[in-house]
Amino acid sequence: MIESIRINLILLLAFFICTSCIVPESTHVNPTFHLLTKTIFDQSGTGIGLSVLPENNKTALSQPFYLRQIELPYYLQENRIVSRPDEAKIEFRENDRWGEPLQEGLGRVLGLNLSQFLNSPFYSVYPQRKKIGTPYEINITILRFEKVSQSEVLIEASWEIFNMEFKNGSYPSQNGKLNRLVEITPTDRGPVTTKDEIKSLSDSLGLLSELVSDSVISSSH
């Protein structure tokens, strides 16, 4: 009798040990990380053609510039990608995230775009140090940068251009604002994907870069 009880206890203990080793199937989904990309211009070079610029505006081209730290609202500093279906509501996506801090990604892409528009390969972007003798400093504030519907993203931004060669270099010589909806175009004739959304956000930075470049050129005279 005692031997039978002992065997049953051993079997019961073995059962609990075996069942405790079973790992439930994980429902975790690895997030996808996304990067903004620069605007691709035509093969002739810059987005602003040298031949169409007034003679007194060409002095801004090929000159170094410094892009200061991009200013962002707090909710855009998350690495989770944001949607904002209405003014009072934001949605964070767990499975779609930025592959770099958005502040740095915006600076990287805007710097590349501006370099192409202004035909200026010698530039610096925060957190890099400003190059000695840089005549232009650019301050950009991004207020909105997100998907607002299934078919559109919104960019809202403002900027200031500082011409350090003027006596009043501590004050902006040019400034401007942009508030633009950009259509999300599916790449594969199917439903809109996050990849399409990121492409449209990148395109919106191209629009912003073109306007900022115009301001830089205007500040040169």
Short names for language-model regions:
Residues 103, 107, 111, 202-205, ...:
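Extracytoplasmic/secreted envelope proteins and their assembly/folding machinery
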Residues 23-41, 48-49, 61, 117-171, ...:
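Surface-exposed short loop/turn segments
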Residues 1-9:
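Bacterial N-terminal signal peptides that target proteins for export
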Residues 90-97, 166-208:
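Short secondary-structure boundary motifs at beta->alpha junctions and helix caps
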Residues 111, 115-119, 213-221:
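Sec-exported extracytoplasmic/periplasmic mature domains
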Residues 8-19:
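Bacterial N-terminal signal peptides
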